Amino acid sequence: MTDTTILPRPEVSGDFLVAALYHFARLPRFESLREQLFELCQKNGVKGTLLLAAEGINGTIAGPDAGVQAVLSFLRAQPEFAALEHKESRASHMPFVRLKVKLKKEIVTMGVPDIDPNRIVGTYVDPRDWNALISDPDTIVIDTRNDYETAIGVFKGAVDPQTKTFREFPDWVKNNPGLHNKPKIAMYCTGGIRCEKATAFMKEQGFDEVYHLKGGILKYLEEVPEEESLWEGACFVFDERVSVVHGLAEGDHQLCHACRNPITPDVRLSPKFEEGVSCPSCYDERSEDDRQRFRDRQQQIELAKTRGERHLGR
C-alpha cells in the first residue's frame, strides 16, 4: 500500500487540539479520499496519521482547533462517516513530527480474514457503566493492547495477554480455553478500535456475551472522576506526549528512542539509561556497536535542536 507524507515545519509553541478517531464502515472508495484528506490537513496545519482501508478509517491528528475541526467536518460530510465519533484532548506542543495519510489493508491489523465489525460486533458499554461490569465476578476483563502499553497502566483485575502486536491476539485467545469459564467477556483498548475488532473475532469464536468499552480508556479517563476510577497507572498514547492520565492531562512518561518503550522519570536515574541510547528494558539486548550508532544519532538530534529544527530520525 502507499502513503503520503510531509516533512515537518519548525515547531510552534502553543496549545494544540488532539483528536483520536476511528470508524468501521464499508468504504470501497477509500483510495480516492487520500489526496483530499492530505491536502486538507496540510492547508489547516494539521499533523498526525490517518489510515484508510476498505473497512473504514483510523488515526490521530493534532493542530489548531479550527484546523482539526475542519478535518472532522470533512470526514462527517462523507456518507460512510456521518456517525464518526472522536475523542479530544490537549497538548502543550505539537505532538506529531509529520503528516501521514496511508492506504492499508486493515485500519487495525489483526490478520484474520473475514473478521468484519460492520457485520458482527460486541456490545458497547459506556464509561460510566464500565466499573459495574468489570467488578462483576462473572466477567473476565481483557486488555487488547500490546505489552509496552500495559506496562504503564491497566484496569484493576484485567488479564494482560502480553502480546507484542495485535496480530498475536487471535492465537492467544485460541490457546486460552479457560476464557470460556465465565459467561461475560469485557475488553478494552486505548480508543476503542482494537477491542471493537477483537469483539468481532470473539463472537466468531463462539463467545456469546462480549462487551467493549465505548471510546476506550481515553473516554473513561475523560468522563470518570479519579476518585471513582478503577484505572491504575497511565495510558500510553501514540504521539509525543507518550502518556495521559485522568482528565487526559499529559503524563510524565517519555520514550526510550532506542527501543520505543515508555519510561518513567525514575528509570532515567538507572545507570542503564542513556538519552537516546538505552534504558533498562533494552540495555542488555544491544551491542556496543548498536549503542554507538544510537549515540551518533542522538548527537544529530541535539545539533538539530540547537538550530531550532526537528530531527526526522527521532
Curated annotation (Swiss-Prot):
Keywords: Oxidoreductase, tRNA processing. Pfam families: Rhodanese, UPF0176_N. The active site is at residue 189. Residues 135-229 form the Rhodanese domain. It catalyses: uridine(34) in tRNA + AH2 + O2 = 5-hydroxyuridine(34) in tRNA + A + H2O. It is an enzyme of class 1 (oxidoreductase). Belongs to the TrhO family. This is tRNA uridine(34) hydroxylase. The gene is trhO.
